[in-house]
Amino acid sequence: MVSSFLLAEYKNLIVNPSEHFKISVNEDNLTEWDVILKGPPDTLYEGGLFKAKIVFPPKYPYEPPRLTFTSEMWHPNIYSDGKLCISILHGDNAEEQGMTWSPAQKIDTVLLSVISLLNEPNPDSPANVDAAKSYRKYLYKEDLESYPMEVKKTVKKSLDECSAEDIEYFKNVPVNVLPVPSDDYEDEEMEDGTYILTYDDEDEEEDEEMDDE
């Protein structure tokens, strides 16, 4: 059963698309989202479009979702299998200076935090030891070539794996393409699993009559 919290978040992201990430969902399973994260500008990851999968547990939002990169990544806090090491996705038993998952978190803020992490690694909590070592050398200007070179490889590969449609999306992200839903709007599920909001014509006619008065 899909929680009302998750459904509400999904609808909100469809109504208010982000320039920083793109989501797509299989209509048969709303608990698994495919995500493309845009590499932050003015960073080594700029230009990359990195694919990831989010899996929501049955008790969401009281338990954190799991995010796994499916694109190849070179980052101190991303394991070789794509799993992510970030404090806000840790459960109650995590000991990350109190920065653990909270039911008040929204998935859009989580995704923005993940994007921010790309440019601000935590080498003291490495998931990829080799990447962490390389990043430290880059950070302390002992080796300014190796880390950027590996990151740029992943940027290029991510673009090679993206469709032309995905690349075009980030060039022309629609902003506020639909009005904020109100009682006058109804949900209509599309074949691809997304939702659109349709306006009740009868309500529109009533509004026009009131205006005429």
Curated annotation (Swiss-Prot):
Active site residues per record: 85 (glycyl thioester intermediate)
Signal peptide region: none
Cofactor: how and how many bound: Binds Mn2+ ion which is required for highest activity. Can also utilize Mg2+ ions.
Reaction equations catalysed: S-ubiquitinyl-[E1 ubiquitin-activating enzyme]-L-cysteine + [E2 ubiquitin-conjugating enzyme]-L-cysteine = [E1 ubiquitin-activating enzyme]-L-cysteine + S-ubiquitinyl-[E2 ubiquitin-conjugating enzyme]-L-cysteine
One Gene Ontology CC term in the entry: virion component
First-level EC class: transferase
Entry GO MF terms: ATP binding; ubiquitin conjugating enzyme activity
Pathway given in the UniProt record: Protein modification; protein ubiquitination
Keyword terms of this UniProt record: ATP-binding, Early protein, Host cytoplasm, Host nucleus, Late protein, Nucleotide-binding, Transferase, Ubl conjugation pathway, Virion
Up-regulation conditions: Expressed in the early phase of the viral replicative cycle.
Enzyme Commission code: 2.3.2.23
Biological processes annotated in GO: protein ubiquitination
Protein location: Host cytoplasm; Host nucleus; Virion
Pfam family, one: UQ_con
Stretches assigned to the UBC core domain: 1-160
Cofactor: Mg(2+)
Family annotation (PANTHER family): UBIQUITIN-CONJUGATING ENZYME E2
Subunit structure: Interacts with host 40S ribosomal protein RPS23. Interacts with host translation initiation factor EIF4E. Interacts with host E3 ubiquitin ligase CUL4B. Interacts with host RNF138.
UniProt similarity note: Belongs to the ubiquitin-conjugating enzyme family.
Function recorded in the entry: Accepts ubiquitin from the E1 complex and catalyzes its covalent attachment to other proteins. Performs the second step in the ubiquitination reaction that targets specifically a protein for degradation via the proteasome. By controlling the ubiquitination status of specific host proteins, the virus may target them to degradation and thereby optimize the viral replication. May be implicated in the shutoff of protein synthesis through its interactions with components of the host translation machinery.
Name of the featured protein: Ubiquitin-conjugating enzyme E2
Lineage: Viruses, Varidnaviria, Bamfordvirae, Nucleocytoviricota, Pokkesviricetes
